[in-house]
Amino acid sequence: NGYFVTKITSFMFLTAMAPNVLALDFVTKITGLNMTWAEWALALALPGLVMLIFVPLVGYWIDRPEAVKIDNKKLAADGLAKLGPMKMSEKILAVVFILALIGWALPSIGFDLSPTAVALVAMTIVFFAGIITWDDMVQTKAVWNTFIWFGAILGLSTALTKAKFFAWLAAYMQANLALDVSPLVVVLILSAISVVIRYLFASSTAYIASMLPVFLTVGMASGVDPVMFGLVLLATNAFGGLVTHYGASPGPIIYSAGYNNLKDWWTAGAILAVLSWVLLFVVGIPWWTFIGMIG
């Protein structure tokens, strides 16, 4: 359940998962849908919250844990006692984090504030306050991998957009692809495929970079609602990783603890991925209609 919850919360906010930025870049360039941090949260937080209610309950029923009763209060009190009072560095980090969230949300109410600038200022404060040292930054290889690869992929995406590659591909598919079904059915089919195909990918970034532009282009060529389709794929990008224990980076770490066998994990993952997919449409479409994002 710990892993399953992380895959749901990963799509609820733009900053919840690093590949979300890349996914939004593709969605914006191919469908025209662009969102601020607050708009993303408004659109996807409610479907995510509903999933957070049902997914752990179903997961508990599918793979019941050996320990069903624990003294939460005592464990929390013991853990808090071990941590001790908040250090000054932790207080500074908490304030910086809250201010960064506010900064990312401000553009949605008319403030001309770059999310990148907010992130850089927050990182600079954290660095000069000594919360993160240069050695910490150098030794965190995953961060540098993300920085380099995301920069390269975003640059390639921009170049393809300027060359009108995605527009050409959409026009070509529209002229040669015959899908005699309604646009909503196309969204259902493509989003389901986007979840199933995650069995072939051990990285959200790899999936987004290689498959998301294809799904987006096929969908646009079929006349789908760009806003609905973009929102759906932004969500399936994350919870599609439910299907396997290697669908995202936390999976192998949690699986290696030895609490679950492969059969139970994959069974629970498949069932919960389907449940999440259903809840996305059952909750998402009425919610997006209510807030005026789709007609």
PLM regions: where:
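Flexible hinge motifs at transmembrane-helix junctions and intramembrane kinks/re-entrant loops
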Residues: L57-W61, M86-K91, L99-K141
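Hydrophobic alpha-helical transmembrane segments in multi-pass integral membrane proteins
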Residues: A100-G103, I153-A171, G223, V227, ...
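Hydrophobic alpha-helical transmembrane segments of multi-pass integral membrane proteins
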Residues: L179-S222, P226, L233-L234
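Small-residue-rich segments of transmembrane alpha-helices in multi-pass membrane proteins
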Residues: T6-I8, A77-K82, N145-L160, P213-G223, ...
